[in-house]
Amino acid sequence: MLDTAQKGWQSSAWDLVTQLGEADGSVAHPHLSLLISSAAASRDLSDAVHALCSVHGDPPGLAVAARTYCVQPDACDWLTAVADAFVGERSYIAQLAAAAGPTPSTPGQAETEAALIASRHALETLARSERRGCATGAVAALVQDWTTIRLLLDHAAERFGIEPVPAGFPSLAETASSVTMLGSTPATERAVSFGAQQLFAQHRALWDLLEARASARNG
């Protein structure tokens, strides 16, 4: 894990989110790398789509909830833009889940469902955090990580016969500028970093779970 205390003032809050994502985000997980390759089994893609639908597909979702609570008033415009984009992402995931068919039969389904519910609740807790910058960091990490997750969704769309749809997120430059401004004090920078770390940890656990399920099916 990145030592944010060492990095301190020398990096912006967005720099910290980006560095955390490179080290601990979805892009670094071997199972996701497999899922976005041509070698991915359709049942594994289906499982991933259904898991993402469970964690991120139900309203309000992290971005919308963070906008609703909006502990950092200066974040509201950026959060609104991200939340609006995720309305489209939820619709896309729902389309993919329908096209992918039922969740593939896998040992330990009850435990999986409990883990996915726990992950969703953890994200809801981040969105409601009263610590200024925490929800901002979680949403910033979600936007950063979603770039890689989108590769999976678009790959699944092609596999299951769905036309990929363009994402509607704010530009990377706009997000970078907003997060840098929102984490411009030592306290808010630490909170942004904490929120981002928690989001990446949830996604890392999700890919670990899906990797274990794929192994159990292939047994």
Predicted regions located by residue number:
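Active-site-proximal alpha-helical scaffolds that flank and shape metal-associated catalytic sites
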Residues: 74-172
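Acidic, low-complexity proline/glycine-rich segments
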Residues: 1-32, 110-115
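Small-residue-biased structural context
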Residues: 4, 28-33, 43, 102, ...
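Hydrophobic alpha-helical segments
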Residues: 146-149, 153-156, 178-185, 199, ...
